[in-house]
Amino acid sequence: MRNENRFHEVRFVIITGMSGAGKSIVIQSFEDLGYFCVDNLPPTFIAKFAELIRQSEGRINKIALVSDIRGGQFFESLQSALYQLNELGIEYEILFLEADTTELINRFKETRRKHPLWNQYNSIKKAIEEERKELEVIRTQSHLIINTSNMSPRQLKDKIRRQYTPEGEYESNLFVSIISFGYKHGLPLDADLVFDVRFLPNPYYVDELRPLSGNDDSVEQYVLHFDATKQFLDKMEDMIQFLLPKYLKEGRTQLIIAVGCTGGRHRSVVISNWLKDKLLKTGYQIALQHRDLDK
């Protein structure tokens, strides 16, 4: 009973639907959300897979799997799998993806891929129509149906993130990494945004501050008390707060912000610490690294 109770805390999503409707994009989106993902799982293995998850005793609590006609004997096997899940008392939800026939035909032509039922019907249109008929029953059992005909990949990803992110946690889907660095040691090659703060007054030239770092209160107070610093921080914060929702909407899951000064020990450390404290209040996941602090 202990394992069964724990499975009620698991979110178990079965992704299915029309070939070409965007299941690959959707499973990638679930992976970005931290789900344990399986693509192209034959329906006959779904119940066994769920049992294994239940035996993990809560170590895996978000699962998404794709099961479609690629798995073979799909139409009968999926109904059997759902029956087994119900018999086992395993809760699940079905996400069904579809698109208009004309749109699906265009997608197969653009990608030059064969519809999985092509060999049976030798016609893309006929294969799509037959697949749609066969999927009608499972469609009526689905908890959510998404028609992707007029959706770009980015819009589909955003739809999944908003649908499957707990209320109030949408911003946490974007991981922001802040890196302080020294230009004398080279730019971080993977940075998305770079702020050069070498124009700020340098504590290095203050004898009592030189041996300290930007993590020390006296250095922080020195750097932050200048009007130029205050103006810069206001403008930088406005820019970043404007950009983060845009990046999130675009489908980004990670953003690397680099802040550089000459040596990476004083000014960039102070500014990076300040930025981290500001962004933590917005709900985004934040990581901070002082790359060159000890060099």
Swiss-Prot record:
Q: Give binding positions for GTP.
A: D68, I69, R70, G71
- Name-wise, this protein is Nucleotide-binding protein Nther_2024
What's a Pfam family this protein contains? RapZ-like_N
**Residue ranges crossing the lipid bilayer per the database entry:** none
Q: Which residues bind ATP?
A: G17, M18, S19, G20, A21, G22, K23, S24
List the source organism: Natranaerobius thermophilus (strain ATCC BAA-1301 / DSM 18059 / JW/NM-WN-LF)
- Alphabetical UniProt keywords: ATP-binding, GTP-binding, Nucleotide-binding
Briefly state the protein's biological role.
Displays ATPase and GTPase activities.
Give the source's domain of life in one word. Answer: Bacteria
Q: Which GO terms describe its molecular function?
A: ATP binding; GTP binding
Q: Which HAMAP family does this chain map to?
A: RapZ_like (MF_00636)
Q: Which family does it belong to?
A: Belongs to the RapZ-like family.
The uppermost taxa in this organism's lineage are:
Bacteria, Bacillati, Bacillota, Clostridia, Natranaerobiales
